[in-house]
């Protein structure tokens, strides 16, 4: 991009060259003054024509430089709008991939829930079989022994009561797990809806960017037509043309500063989105690791340890879900702020172009 300091340097060089040409013309006129009266008359006519031609050449040269600077500024604005449109399309594709990933994870959670229900049913079936076997053995022992049978029967009753208590605790924990799983599924649906809203917002933003690009192209054609009309109407207004040139240079510098700030904001936004995605992935990996470890260790522990591990796994899952929700709310708030800033910059840019 052309630096703001380069244009004054080019203008100085143009002024220096123009002065050099005028000095050459003045030297030629000095030589003509030393000629005879008739030659002086011809020299004066020649000098008048040379002055008119040099003035016309200077005006045309400045107009050509002005038109070149305007065209370069408009081409750079169009290139920046194209880059912005490409970045928005990439961001839209990333959001779509995230939505698909969340759907896949939701299906995995549903599968895990079904496996847990099957495990519970199998546990109940085995418990019923053990109770029947226990009753059969108790009756056989009553027929064979008396006092020992009574003592063992009391022990068996205690163990049976403890087993029932554990079964009730397991049922309570199972209900809590189902409630928390339902809540987590609802939160996942909310996240998916938010992603869909974000995708629609990005599509609208892409459409606005395309409209801005079309408007810029139309403005370029309109400015070109106005430039031709200005060259015809203002051929003798040198001072006004110089002021317009300085104003356009100032506007171009402001547009360059706005474009640099906007590019920096977009890069910062992309870095923050990547950081939030990395944190969310870490939380998801931790949750998966906890579920895998729970499934591996479930068969190796007794009922009391299994209940404890279930409680800890539920607490970790709830904590991870809360952390993920907080990070998503922060990301949503920050994204809204960035969108507001971007809209303000777009309004300022359209105002400067108009």
Curated annotation (Swiss-Prot):
Which keywords does this Swiss-Prot/TrEMBL entry list? Coiled coil, Cytoplasm, Nucleus
Q: Principal place where this protein is found? A: cytoplasm
Q: Which InterPro entries match?
A: CCDC89-like
Cystine links in this protein are: none
Would the keyword Ligase be found if you checked this record's keyword annotation? Answer: no
**What GO cellular-component annotations does this UniProt entry give?**
cytoplasm; nucleus
**Domain of life according to the entry:** Eukaryota
Coiled-coil residues = 10-334
| Annotated family | Belongs to the CCDC89 family.
Subunit composition and interactions: Interacts with hey1.
Q: What is this protein called?
A: Coiled-coil domain-containing protein 89
Q: Which organism is it from?
A: Danio rerio
């Amino acid at each position: 991009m052309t630096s703001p300091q380069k244009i004054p340097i080019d203008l100085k060089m143009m002024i220096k060259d123009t002065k050099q040409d005028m000095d050459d013309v003045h030297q030629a006129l000095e030589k003509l003054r030393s000629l005879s009266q008739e030659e002086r008359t011809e020299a004066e006519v020649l000098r008048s024509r040379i002055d008119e031609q040099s003035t016309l050449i200077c005006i045309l040269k400045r107009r050509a430089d002005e038109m070149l600077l305007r065209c370069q500024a408009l081409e750079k604005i169009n290139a920046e709008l194209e880059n912005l449109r490409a970045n928005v399309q990439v961001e839209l594709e990333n959001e779509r991939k995230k939505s698909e990933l969340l759907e896949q994870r939701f299906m995995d959670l549903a599968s895990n829930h079904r496996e847990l229900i099957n495990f519970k049913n199998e546990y109940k079936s085995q418990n019923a079989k053990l109770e029947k076997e226990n009753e059969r053995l108790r009756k056989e022992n009553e027929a064979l022994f008396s006092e020992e049978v009574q003592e063992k029967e009391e022990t068996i009753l205690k163990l049976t009561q403890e087993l029932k208590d554990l079964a009730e605790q397991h049922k309570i924990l199972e209900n809590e797990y189902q409630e928390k799983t339902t809540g987590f599924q609802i939160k996942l649906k909310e996240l998916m809806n938010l992603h869909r809203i974000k995708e629609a917002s990005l599509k609208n933003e892409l459409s606005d960017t395309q409209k801005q690009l079309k408007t810029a192209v139309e403005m370029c054609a309109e400015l070109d037509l106005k430039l031709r009309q200005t060259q015809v109407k203002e051929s003798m207004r040198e001072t006004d043309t110089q002021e317009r040139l300085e104003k356009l240079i100032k506007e171009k510098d402001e547009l360059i500063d706005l474009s640099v700030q906007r590019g920096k904001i977009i890069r910062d936004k992309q870095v923050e989105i990547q950081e939030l995605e990395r944190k969310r992935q870490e939380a998801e990996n931790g949750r998966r690791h906890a579920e895998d470890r729970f499934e591996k260790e479930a068969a190796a522990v007794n009922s009391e340890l299994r209940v404890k591990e279930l409680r800890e796994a539920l607490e970790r899952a709830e904590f991870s879900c809360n952390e993920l929700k907080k990070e998503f709310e922060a990301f949503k708030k920050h994204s809204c702020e960035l969108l507001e800033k971007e809209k303000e910059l777009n309004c300022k840019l359209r105002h400067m172009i108009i």
